[in-house]
Amino acid sequence: MATTTSCSLLLSSTLFLHSPPSSHLSFFNLSSSRSSPISLYPIRSKRYFRILSKLSLNDNNRDDDDDTLHFTPFSAVKPFFLLCTSVALSFSLFAASPAVESASAFVVSTPKKLQTDELATVRLFQENTPSVVYITNLAVRQDAFTLDVLEVPQGSGSGFVWDKQGHIVTNYHVIRGASDLRVTLADQTTFDAKVVGFDQDKDVAVLRIDAPKNKLRPIPVGVSADLLVGQKVFAIGNPFGLDHTLTTGVISGLRREISSAATGRPIQDVIQTDAAINPGNSGGPLLDSSGTLIGINTAIYSPSGASSGVGFSIPVDTVGGIVDQLVRFGKVTRPILGIKFAPDQSVEQLGVSGVLVLDAPPSGPAGKAGLQSTKRDGYGRLVLGDIITSVNGTKVSNGSDLYRILDQCKVGDEVTVEVLRGDHKEKISVTLEPKPDES
């Protein structure tokens, strides 16, 4: 291939001087700064060689015969001829070089299209990020010198659109202590928000904004009961104020338990994930690979306050019931037994399993049903109260088990409580009531 190319170039340069009868070419004098044109006309061979023999370096030598070749000195054409020959030879050597051929194998090709999983992630983000909002928590402060009342940003967090009526779901700790709340949608429009209601025990709150319905994109709601460890999850939020940030990971664990930041009450069945969750992600959605909501990002385990690969989300099955009550009634009507119980560690030291009743006020459901409190006798000796071992046939080993069972009940439900009283067991029927401050 290289030989053929070089030969073709040499032949072309030769034919350039031996033009066929019908040709007429113009180019520039390579040896002159004047760039005067050179013309080639048809000639006869004998006449051609005779003219070449008379050519000199004098540019004024001309032949005025009809068959004249109007030509600059041959010295002007010679460099061009040599240049063509050199180029042909160089190209021949270059094409034949094996080093160049081997190097060509490493040329970077045009980037290919995104892979299938990448396209799915991009599509998931584009479809769901319009549902995610940025929440600014403003607190009222009074200037010590001017006594002016100022609104100072106290914190920020994330949330998501629940419905077309403008309800926004987030964490309670995101809005706690706020005097003024503002919600920024994906198109950067900002609206004042009002608190519809909140559940401190589960760290869930619902806000409402007066926004046009065409600006509201409710998030698709999924289920969390059938989640599996290892499946992909996606978190969208505003970490450190960086709005609409996507992080990915997997479900690292299920049925975890964390405590409510407001009340200390345990939140059960929490989802653990290694998707990066940082300050500002609180209240944002955790999505499965189909783009449906499976949890609310609420906490991280980190000594430094930044993501350490251990994040927690409240499962959507828990959130759904709470949000429905908050939207309808502005509060959560959660059933209670009406008791105070001992820390789990204290019961473990007794060598028994269950929940030790410390106090069952007579006005509460458990007190009305006859559950006994822990007390001291006339000699000052401690007399243990009832130890709850099961509710409706479900074993109760600690306080978390009791809360989990009650979360599945409603106000007015009658439950059967089995207790250990002294050295014997008893079953007592208790009618559940709402918390006094929620009635």
Swiss-Prot record:
Give residue ranges for domain PDZ. Answer: 326-423
Q: What induces it?
A: By heat shock.
Q: Which SUPFAM superfamilies does this chain map to?
A: PDZ domain-like (SSF50156), Trypsin-like serine proteases (SSF50494)
Localization per record: Plastid, Chloroplast thylakoid membrane
Residues forming the catalytic site: 173, 203, 282
Q: How is its activity regulated?
A: Inhibited by phenylmethylsulfonyl fluoride and O-phenanthroline.
UniProt record, GO biological process: photosystem II repair; protein catabolic process; proteolysis
Q: What GO cellular component is one of the record's annotations?
A: chloroplast
SMART domains with a match to the protein in the record: PDZ (SM00228)
Q: Name one GO molecular function term.
A: serine-type peptidase activity
Top EC class of this enzyme: hydrolase
Where are the residues of the annotated region Serine protease?
154-323
Coiled coil residues, start to end: none
As for family, the record states:
Belongs to the peptidase S1C family.
Question: Subunit comment for this entry?
Answer: Interacts with PTAC16 and other potential targets for degradation under high light conditions.
Task: Write down what this protein is called.
Answer: Protease Do-like 1, chloroplastic
